[in-house]
């Protein structure tokens, strides 16, 4: 089963019949329109390309306009691709709704995490701070030593140091599906998902379910 592209609306909570509060993230999944179907013969692999949402006509390039017109769909805010498992078939112009998750218990959600800019090691890697006093007047939040000695005489690749934090692709796995609202194109999942409100999300059935 393929996934769908949605948009993060925000977080809220719902109550069960027993009065238990469940924190949920609301994901709006408008109909995903199939723009292209890739095949083994033509492309070397099986996949389906989809778009969703809308894009202003004056923001659509001519190549994009031709691509959407060929599929007979309205121009969307982007293009996403999902590998097609054996036995599943789609056609260009077809619409896929949030209802495909009606019988799914858990999902994996992929998004772009919030960018935090340049961050130090305490914030980025949870390094502990050094002494506040006892002779330490300058080095409270510095990382400390980053190497050894003349041997190896270098800083190893992957060393945890200060640098850019966030704004990267993150996947949260096996989130419980709490509710599927087909009328309003909403999917409610338990817990938090990556990214800011309004960010694009890719929702797939959980691989570890």
From Swiss-Prot:
Keyword Transmembrane attributed: no
Positions carrying N5-methylglutamine: 150
Keywords attached to this entry: Methylation, Ribonucleoprotein, Ribosomal protein, RNA-binding, rRNA-binding
GO molecular function, one term: rRNA binding
Residue ranges the record marks as coiled coil: none
Domain of life of the organism encoding this protein: Bacteria
Entries under InterPro entries matching the protein: Ribosomal_uL3 (IPR000597), Ribosomal_uL3_bac/org-type (IPR019927), Ribosomal_uL3_CS (IPR019926), Transl_B-barrel_sf (IPR009000)
Matching Gene3D superfamilies: 3.30.160.810, Translation factors
One GO BP annotation of this record: translation
PROSITE patterns per UniProt: RIBOSOMAL_L3
Region (Disordered): 133-152
Cellular component GO terms, alphabetical: cytosolic large ribosomal subunit
PTM: Methylated by PrmB.
Record note on quaternary structure: Part of the 50S ribosomal subunit. Forms a cluster with proteins L14 and L19.
Family from the record: Belongs to the universal ribosomal protein uL3 family.
Its biological purpose: One of the primary rRNA binding proteins, it binds directly near the 3'-end of the 23S rRNA, where it nucleates assembly of the 50S subunit.
Record's protein name: Large ribosomal subunit protein uL3
Organism: Yersinia enterocolitica serotype O:8 / biotype 1B (strain NCTC 13174 / 8081)
Upper taxonomic lineage: Bacteria, Pseudomonadati, Pseudomonadota, Gammaproteobacteria, Enterobacterales
């Amino acid at each position: 089963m393929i996934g769908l592209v949605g948009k993060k609306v925000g977080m809220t909570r719902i109550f069960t019949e027993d009065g238990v509060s469940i924190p949920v993230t609301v994901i709006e999944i408008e109909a995903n329109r199939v723009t292209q179907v890739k095949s083994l013969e033509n492309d070397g692999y099986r996949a389906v390309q989809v778009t969703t949402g809308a894009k202003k006509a004056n923001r659509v390039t001519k190549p994009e306009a031709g691509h959407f017109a060929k599929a007979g769909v309205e121009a969307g805010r982007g293009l996403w691709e999902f590998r097609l498992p054996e036995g599943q078939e789609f056609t260009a112009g077809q619409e896929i709704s949030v209802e495909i998750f009606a019988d799914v218990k858990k999902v994996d959600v992929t998004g772009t995490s919030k960018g935090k800019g340049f961050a130090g090691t305490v914030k980025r890697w949870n390094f502990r701070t050094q002494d506040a006093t006892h002779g330490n007047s300058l080095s409270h939040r510095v990382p400390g030593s980053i190497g050894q000695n003349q041997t190896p005489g270098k800083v190893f690749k992957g060393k945890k140091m200060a640098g850019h934090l966030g704004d990267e692709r993150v996947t949260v796995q096996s989130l419980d599906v709490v509710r599927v609202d087909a009328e309003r194109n909403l999917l409610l999942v338990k817990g938090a998902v990556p990214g800011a409100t309004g960010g694009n999300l890719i929702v797939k059935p959980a691989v570890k379910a």
